[in-house]
Amino acid sequence: MPHHHSQNPVNPELSPPSPRRSDAGKIRLQRRDADGLVTLADMYAAPYDLLAVRLDVAEDRVRGIVARWRDAGLAANGKLAEGPQWCWLTPAGMRQVGHGWEAAPPPLARLAHIRAVLAARLFMEGDAAWTAGRAWWRCERRLRASRPGVGQPGHIPDAEILWPSIPGSPRAGETWAVEVELTPKPLARVQRIISGLLAQPYAVILYLCAPAALPVVTQAAGNFRPEQSARVLVRTLPSAALMRGAA
């Protein structure tokens, strides 16, 4: 089963927004552009350094790639916090990738979490087991879109990992829930979240935690019956997940 970004073909030609532009003509979008634009839609926004990893280019090339998107009216960029610039889709860019989600600068209060979830995704996608199992990432926005009403109970995780039913795959047919934790929550709240996820048909509940959040999540995961605790994997987030200056 392909990754999400390959499920959203982007029109290869896009007319520029104004006929008065000096480079009037059509901008040809390549596969890399499609991957990047769909990633921005899925993940709300992306900082340049992680976008470079996602596109498999040197970080200094991202500026030019984003400039092409911006000139085409598909994306916007800005300095939202200490560290690299950020990029996000415009409404035209969101329409281009085929979604009706909001297209706007990410809220400053959510930057750290958005960065951490994208870094977690890149971390998982870089693992050999991911490639061998042809796993794919189902983002929070897609999960929320699939549960539009109050008739769909249950905690919505930060993402799901879907493992297709490939013969010989140790994870064939499994669905994992992914939770990204940056700061410690009250123990009772973490236990309620884990309990809600255990009640859903997830084979694994994967917690990727910043160092500050690791102890409480580890403790909460150990407070369930052994067969339930065995479904909860607690791991440390990669250092790239943390905002500059974060502990």
Task: Please tell me what each predicted stretch does.
Residues 120, 124:
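Acidic, glycine-rich loop-and-strand cores that form catalytic or ligand-binding grooves
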Residues 2-21, 25-39, 47-48, 184-192, ...:
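Non-catalytic C-terminal interaction segments of nucleic acid-processing enzymes
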Residues 78, 108-110, 125, 129-176, ...:
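Active-site metal-binding core of divalent-cation-utilizing nuclease and nuclease-like domains
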Residues 56, 125-126, 199-203:
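Short glycine/proline-enriched coil/turn segments at helix->beta-strand junctions
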Residues 177-179, 206-207:
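Short catalytic-loop micro-motif centered on adjacent basic/acidic residues
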Residues 1-105:
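Nuclease-adjacent, charged terminal/linker segments that flank catalytic cores
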Residues 101-118:
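A short, highly charged nucleic-acid-interacting micro-segment common to nuclease
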Residues 75, 137, 232-234:
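Generic structural signal for residues in well-ordered beta-strands
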